[in-house]
Amino acid sequence: MSTIEEQLKALREETLASLKQITAENEKEMQDLRVSVLGKKGSLTEILKGMKDVSAEMRPIIGKHVNEARDVLTAAFEETAKLLEEKKVAAQLASESIDVTLPGRPVAAGHRHVLTQTSEEIEDIFIGMGYQVVDGFEVEQDYYNFERMNLPKDHPARDMQDTFYITEEILLRTHTSPVQARAMDAHDFSKGPLKMISPGRVFRRDTDDATHSHQFHQIEGLVVGKNISMADLQGTLQLIVQKMFGEERQIRLRPSYFPFTEPSVEVDVSCFKCGGEGCNVCKKTGWIEIMGAGMVHPRVLEMSGIDATVYSGFAFGLGQERVAMLRYGINDIRGFYQGDVRFSEQFK
């Protein structure tokens, strides 16, 4: 065996032994070893300098051994680098491992908005009384919003409801009454009376302040059937108020005017803060205005093809914001819409 072959064998054995000693923490040591063995001034290059002393017959053989040694050492360095990287990744994963048996961070539970809570409570009251809940369009026709409610185009009461018009005949509804008109059109009175509520968002051209908003929520109710009287309306209103504000509450009806009811009334509830004695909430009167109501105007019935000499009905409407403000002592309607979590969290 020639001297070069012996040197190659010794270099391979020493290098492979050194690679086995290198750990992931000493990766630079492997790079230094690679340069010292395979670099331009490395050990293998020094061995090759002895080729000038090898006979011409032996040079191909020795050259083959040199190439084999270079290939073996190069593969060994690559394999070691791969192993070190795998160990490094494994160590990192181990340090970042998660104990899946540990309890997780609690997820903050959401809750319904106070207006949603109020609406659902009111709807549940009416569902328990046999009413159906009917939804309708927020973008409505002038015909259903006004004319079907006994408000023709030249009616002075239209000035009471400043309206967001999209076109001359299309608008954002100012109340949920159009839902009632469509329901009367579709109802089969041969199967019994119509009892419904129509909750939803409505729009008025009001300037936003503590008690007014350009959008708010209404729940309007309607009952149409045979022999429906003012006494039925009063009894229904009394029951509704007691379920919303407490069994001890009483109501008072005051004459009023609405184009779609005749007679029309404003409904007051006995003050739930002072019990009727008079306080700042009821403005010393002992009563708080809560909703409007009345007997359905015969013209409204007739526009749905209902014989007003046979059928009669009553209607009422109240605002969810109004109910929530009274129940929870809220003094600014804007709080419902500003998205302040501090406000919402009070009503979990």
From Swiss-Prot:
Q: Where does Mg(2+) bind?
A: E262
Which parts of the chain span the membrane according to its record? Answer: none
- Localization: Cytoplasm
Per its UniProt record, what InterPro entries does this chain match? aa-tRNA-synth_II, aa-tRNA-synth_II/BPL/LPL, Phe-tRNA-synth_IIc_asu, Phe-tRNA_ligase_II_N, Phe_tRNA_ligase_alpha1_bac, Phenylalanyl-tRNA_Synthase, tRNA-bd_arm
Q: Needs which cofactor?
A: Mg(2+)
Primary localisation category:
cytoplasm
Protein keywords: Aminoacyl-tRNA synthetase, ATP-binding, Cytoplasm, Ligase, Magnesium, Metal-binding, Nucleotide-binding, Protein biosynthesis
Which EC number(s) does UniProt give? Answer: 6.1.1.20
Q: Name one GO cellular component term.
A: cytoplasm
Which range is the signal sequence, renumbered to this chain? none
Q: How does it assemble?
A: Tetramer of two alpha and two beta subunits.
Q: Which family does it belong to?
A: Belongs to the class-II aminoacyl-tRNA synthetase family. Phe-tRNA synthetase alpha subunit type 1 subfamily.
- Name it: Phenylalanine--tRNA ligase alpha subunit
Q: Which organism is it from?
A: Streptococcus pneumoniae (strain JJA)
Taxonomic path: Bacteria, Bacillati, Bacillota, Bacilli, Lactobacillales
